[in-house]
Design a protein with these regions (language model features):
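Membrane-interface interhelical loops and short amphipathic "cap" helices
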Residues: 1-10, 39, 63-85, 134-152, ...
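Long, contiguous internal "core" modules enriched in hydrophobic/ aromatic residues
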Residues: 14-18, 90-92, 97-266
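Alpha-helical membrane-inserting segments
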Residues: 29, 57-60, 166, 170
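Long, hydrophobic/aromatic-enriched structural stretches that serve as scaffold segments
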Residues: 50-109, 123-126
Length: 287
């Protein structure tokens, strides 16, 4: 019992991965609109470097969970049969296709037609990657606290909360602005509202889940307090993002960076609670 912080490598991997997928989708859609100049397009492509840095950090963290980086190769032994193998494989493919395509685009070796195909394929691979993350946890019927609709909702809501802000931040770094970007905070705000509903409904459901030795609600005694802190951090992040725009100003890049750090902190708290809720239907409860 606890708050799940012992699983911090997985927390970093899943939260960073979901935010990166969301951020890539934002940048890809910006490039595919055809409204950017060639110079702006090249700057946007260059800003994608930030995505791959975060994804690299996530994968490094995931190998720490395995105990040794060499074990990462063993985790691919059952692709197609194991949810864990599928998660690692789909993430590696997303990372490889996205990273190699990005390198070719930065070096101006990727024709316009192929670039559009690369963007679409990588977006699809990213969504598949997040879904494979969900399947690792949502297919274990002996863990009733994960075997619920709240698992896929929580994972994809992280994509919709953190992805738009990360994409907006990188677009601002690239010097791109426009009315369409004003819709991105709305996406994150709506996702936050849905996330709050999920927290409330999941919290009420925990009281009904029990094993032969434990109640689910006792796994993370501070569930309500931790989730309240999560919501506060996410709300502060959106305030840093939205308030300047409401006042008719562009948010400073430094302020957007702070907002993204707050998003990461909030989502890490939520993901820690998720791992802290691990329990089985038998006699044992993970410590």
């Amino acid at each position: 019992m606890g708050n799940g912080w012992h699983e911090w490598p997985l927390m970093v991997f899943t939260v960073f991965g979901q935010c990166v997928v969301g951020g890539f989708i934002v940048l890809a859609l910006a490039l595919m609109t055809g409204k950017l100049s060639r110079e702006q397009e090249q700057r946007v492509v260059g800003s994608m470097f930030g995505l791959w840095v975060l994804m690299g950090i996530g994968f490094i963290a995931s190998t720490m969970h395995l105990g040794s980086p060499l074990r990462a190769f063993n985790s691919l032994n059952r692709v197609g049969a194991s949810s864990l193998s599928n998660e690692i494989a789909s993430g590696a493919i997303f990372f490889a296709v996205g990273g190699i395509g990005w390198l070719l685009a930065v070096c101006k070796k990727l024709p316009a037609g192929l670039r559009s195909l690369w963007l679409v394929v990588t977006m699809v691979l990213g969504v598949i990657f997040v879904w494979m993350m969900v399947r690792v946890y949502n297919t274990i019927d002996t863990v009733p606290t994960w075997y619920t609709v709240w698992t896929p909702l929580s994972f994809f809501l992280t994509l919709f909360i953190g992805g738009p802000l990360l994409g907006y931040l990188l677009l601002r770094v690239a010097g791109v602005d426009g009315w369409a970007l004003r819709l991105l905070p709305v996406v994150s705000l709506l996702a936050l509202l849905v996330s709050i509903m999920v927290v409330v409904m999941q919290g009420s459901e925990l009281a009904t889940i029990r094993s032969s030795v434990h109640h689910a609600s006792a796994l993370v005694p501070d569930y309500g307090l931790l989730m309240a802190w999560r919501v506060v951090l996410l709300a502060l992040a959106l305030a840093c993002w939205c308030v300047p725009q409401i006042r008719g100003r562009k948010p400073a890049v430094s302020l957007l960076g702070l907002a993204f750090v707050l998003i990461l902190a909030g989502e890490m708290i939520g993901r820690g609670v998720f791992y802290g809720l691990h329990m089985t239907v038998g006699m044992a409860v993970a410590s």
